[in-house]
Amino acid sequence: MTHPLVLQLRFTRKEFMRGLEGLGEADAQKRILPMNCISWNVGHLAWQEQRYFLYYAQNQLPFPQINEAFAYGAPASTPTLGEVRAAWAEITEAAEPWLDSRTSSDLVAKVVRNGKPSRYIYGSLILRMIYHYWYHTGENMAIRQSLGHVELPEFVGDIDGEAPYKPE
């Protein structure tokens, strides 16, 4: 059975992507300073997913260019939405088997980096990922509103139907 925290991550990813519905390439690449553009935000979350669930968890780095272009503190850029969405989709799909196999005891295990236990545990990384998605979901909605987009999705979607609270 999939851990409830992983189910919440999946719902959060879905809501993040729902916030991109109807967004064209040109608007996805527009920067309203000092914010990054929406497409950069997608790449940034792909970077974090890859870092936590592929690199830290499985020692895989399938998209080194994502690691370089969208890491925390990386310079602003205006990538195409199609490019970063495709990378995001591949990264999140590659993370699924690992996420599906997590147990509560796995989630309190320390992340090992450079052969040494770090101060992080996997459950906290999942929480960090969830909260980071919501941060950028709100930022993306603000950018879209500033660009004059209307009839945007309301949040937090159908949490009661799709991701209600479930005990372990």
Map each language-model feature to its residues.
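Short, contiguous alpha-helical
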Residues: 6-10, 17, 25-71, 113-168
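A structural signal for long alpha-helical coiled-coils and helix-turn connectors
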Residues: 24, 99-103, 144
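Short, charged, low-complexity loops and linkers
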Residues: 1-5, 74-77
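Acidic/histidine-rich alpha-helical segments that form the ligand environment
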Residues: 73-113, 120-135
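Hydrophobic alpha-helical core bundles mediating ligand binding, dimerization, or RNAP-core interactions
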Residues: 9, 13, 20, 88, ...
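Short, flexible helix-adjacent loops and helix caps
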Residues: 21-28, 104-107
